[in-house]
Amino acid sequence: MQAPRREDARRQGEGLATLSEAAPRSSGDGGADGIAPLAQEADRLAQEGGRGQPAAPGTATLEPPERGGGGDPSAVLSIRPRQEVAGRGRPSADAAAGQPVPPTLWYKDAVIYEVHVRTFFDGNGDGTGDFRGLTAKLDYLQELGVTALWLLPFYPSPLADDGYDVADYTAVHPAYGTLGDFKRFLAEAHRRGMRVITDLVLNHTSTQHPWFQRARRARPGSRWRDFYVWSDSPDRYRGVRVIFPDYEADNWTWDPVARAYYWHRFYAHQPDLNYDNPMVRRAMLKVVDFWLRLGLDGFRLDALPYLFEREGTACAGLPETHAFVRELRAYIEARYGERVLLAEANEPAAELARYLQGDECHMAFHFPLMPRLFLALAREEAAPILQVLRDEPAIAPACQWALFLRNHDELTLEMVSPQEREELWQAYAADPQARVNLGIRRRLAPLLGNDRRRLELAYALLFSLPGTPVIYYGDEIGMGDNIYLPDRHAVRTPMQWSGGRNAGFSTANPQRLCAPVVVDPPYHYEAVNVEAQLASPDSLLNWLRRLIAVRKRFPAFGRGDLELIAGDNRRVLAFVRRLGDQAILVVANLSRFVQGVRLDLAAYAGCLPEDAFGGATLPPIERRPYFLTLGPHGFYWFVLKRPEGEIPEPR
């Protein structure tokens, strides 16, 4: 490994102490005396984030709060632009060379690839993936058709939860490289036209974070103590569900140093921050400033619903949380223009839609749809998908659903009924070892029995239903998993690049790898790897590259409306994606057997269905039902073309 540059070494050396300076200091731990007005503090934080550079014209300021701490965040984080409005909405002049291009709602047309830096590619041979390795593989991702990268946390951390236990928000974990390595990666990604977003872990920190270490030693009721949520009794917020019931019995844990209980919605080593404390909100604004000034394109807001707690509620999705997200959005847009906020909120669709009304997040993961895609495949009928699509609440025109099949977590089954959950467990995780909490810890290929037809059908739906598709690293080649690894590490094994040493992931001795490579058939890295699939024209990888290329030809997939098409076969799903004069008919057979279907396409009478992949044209649509036959788990994407070039208005 090369020696880090002086500036990078200084950043790493500052390490965990950096954000101890996030809040203003006072002569003691008690009270709110000595807290600078938020307007002044915001400017100071912005200047620090830019290494002493002045804020750009159009920078927003924050209205000062009422003295004394908590209260409604909407009264604390009130955005008002400065008088210099000429540059409003534009990035600051001192931004890094990797500065994003002006916003164009790019996320609606994006193909997002989720990558774990730790397990993607090792660039220095120490057994752990890093930013040098990720940079080296950007050409591969570009050729796949990826247009945006979502990075899992790469901050300094004890790694008790694979980086979601953050110990310093404004540095790079030494195992993954330096801040300079990150900047070079970001510049190279932008040079290829790829956007980059990363996880912003708002809800909690590690117990090793300096904030928590100071809080547990501070006087009860002091401003430092109140960085977290404390109680003398574990009886507060009774009835609030435990998210990880396999690992935690309660949301409260006793701290012998503080001699009090602290609140945590996830693991006991991840105490929740207290967002009723304006100092916490200021500190997180500093984190946002730091990364956006480097040119980051946005954030996935991790565990978003749980920022606030209120007695007598489920402590999820509270009005205070939505108020904070609105102010965060306004703060970012006033300073940096449009950067994307992607909500991770495992909630019902009606609750999720509240984040997508145009003034909070740009995108949200569609947690209600994902398990019903698998339920439809298990039942071999379209009803579970249709139920979600018909009941889907309206979202703002500029907002978008993020669609996914798998990710780094378990396949969560919280958004289905207990009966449906049991049905899904029996279908996809008959082995109890494959289950964790209320979900399944398997990758996509093992979930679908490594059945190529089912995999292709799942991807065809992912890339054609309304929303932006998100691919989990390794799923493009049908990687397997390792359920002998604990918890969710089962689906976070090293990327399989070749059939050589360590699957081509690292040149280190196998004993030094951050995680073992998959060696069990049929997913052994010698059989399932990028190198072999690139050489095979009919591989899953090359098939997916073609699918992505076809999707990119039709903006209707990313921006168009959805029209459900009636048919006479419950095992077939049919819909039209439409944008202006562009209309794409999607027909999918959810059964393992050949199916015929008569579709009501009278509204498109006279149109010629043209295969989006090969260009073959079918007979023209008439007013009577249109008959199609689909192979097992087969699908069609037809471009509906009228000879004179006009498409009729939908009914």
Give the location of each predicted region.
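Compositionally biased, low-complexity intrinsically disordered regions
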Residues: 30, 71-74, 80
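Compositionally biased, intrinsically disordered low-complexity segments enriched
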Residues: 40-41, 47
